[in-house]
């Protein structure tokens, strides 16, 4: 452990083991909470299946002068070799044991562009589902025949390997089958950020995780994505915040994006926040009632870029905007992307709170001052280059 570091300054570091030396990396400490930095610059990224593409976006990101990086999940993928693509191949079968997860993390860490970016600045990381199992929820596996007790054994292995391989605080040391990942950070009084865990405490996806209208199951007050303890912690953190900007770094789309498929009613993802509409409305109502300063939600997961206005109910455009949401595309997952999709005009017509949408690969860079938030979307046409 390195102690007595001064606030708001850069440090350089190098590792030496058995006569072998690493490249020289750099990191920085954040400004003191009660100071007022003029500017902050960061990037956020997610979803980097090495089978579906190269991590080219990190080469561009490493050219930027960033204070930090948020990674919003799907840092690794659990699938068996060849399941997702042919650009590169995972080693072995679908990962389940501690050894499996350690090897998969090591394989991803071998990527030179990922190494390059880790050596540039500090990272705030959180997981989504693929660090463990696709669309998992608490102790419930995507595979219906897996018992919760068996899935928790797998979860403990995944969490242990994640902690060993990711830049995390001591407060995140795993305990049995659990690991506390949600936490706070700040960049002086310019920004405070709450990093969430949207998988470990969530109830099962309603409607069998099938795209559905906002029905009774999606509105169930007992359903939760965050769990009671984390939700209360988030509210308290927002109340106590002194930041001009309040960043909520999390996994899945909070915007209520519905698709019609030529049907009268819109259908919504039950794995995203529309599947937990009651809790979503409660959080946004809280932000509005408490007049939280400039809440901005950062999201990954769906391999595309979005800029959304967030309301308590996004279907009611005549109500006030409570927060903004920026959804960042994938580093590699999904393979080659596209600038516009075929039905984009209808998508935005059905969901007028969407202000931008794009499906190329890349990352998002954000620059904050006391008065402005600027997003630059960096994209690439091909994932195999």
Question: What kind of region is each of these model predictions?
Answer:
Residues 1-380:
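Metal-dependent phosphoester/phosphodiester hydrolase catalytic core
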């Amino acid at each position: 452990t390195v102690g007595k570091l001064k606030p708001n300054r850069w440090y350089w570091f190098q590792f030496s083991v058995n006569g072998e030396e690493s490249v020289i990396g750099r990191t920085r400490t954040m400004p003191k909470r009660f100071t007022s930095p003029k500017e902050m610059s960061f990037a956020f990224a997610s979803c980097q299946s090495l089978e579906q593409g190269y991590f080219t976006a990190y080469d561009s990101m490493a050219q930027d002068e960033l204070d930090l990086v948020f990674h919003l999940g799907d840092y690794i993928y659990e699938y068996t070799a060849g399941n997702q693509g042919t650009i590169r191949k995972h080693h072995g079968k679908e990962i389940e044991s501690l050894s499996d997860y350690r090897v998969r993390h090591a394989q991803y860490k071998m990527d030179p562009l990922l190494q390059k970016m880790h050596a540039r600045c500090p990272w705030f990381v959180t997981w989504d589902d693929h660090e463990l199992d696709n669309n998992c929820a608490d102790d419930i596996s995507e595979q219906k025949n897996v018992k919760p007790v068996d899935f928790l054994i797998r979860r403990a292995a995944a969490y242990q390997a994640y902690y060993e391989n990711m830049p995390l605080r001591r407060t995140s040391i795993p305990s049995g089958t659990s690991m506390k990942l949600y936490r706070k950070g700040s960049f002086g009084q310019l920004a405070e950020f709450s990093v969430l865990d949207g998988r470990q405490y969530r109830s099962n996806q309603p409607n069998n995780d099938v795209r559905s209208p906002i029905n009774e199951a999606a509105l169930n007050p007992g359903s939760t994505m965050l769990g009671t303890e984390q939700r209360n912690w988030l509210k308290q953190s927002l109340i106590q915040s002194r930041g001009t900007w309040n960043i909520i770094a999390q996994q899945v789309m909070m915007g209520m994006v519905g698709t019609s498929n030529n049907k009268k009613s819109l259908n919504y993802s039950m794995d995203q926040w529309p599947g937990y509409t009651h809790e979503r409305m409660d959080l946004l109502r809280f932000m509005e009632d408490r007049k939280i300063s400039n809440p901005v939600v950062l999201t990954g997961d769906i391999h595309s870029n979005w800029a959304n206005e967030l309301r308590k109910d996004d279907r009611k455009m005549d109500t006030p905007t409570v927060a903004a949401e920026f959804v960042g595309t994938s580093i590699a997952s999904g393979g080659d992307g596209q600038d516009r999709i075929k039905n984009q005009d209808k998508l935005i017509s059905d969901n007028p709170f969407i202000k931008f949408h794009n499906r190329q690969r890349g990352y998002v860079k954000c620059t904050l001052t006391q008065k402005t938030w600027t997003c630059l979307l960096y994209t690439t046409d091909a994932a195999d280059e």
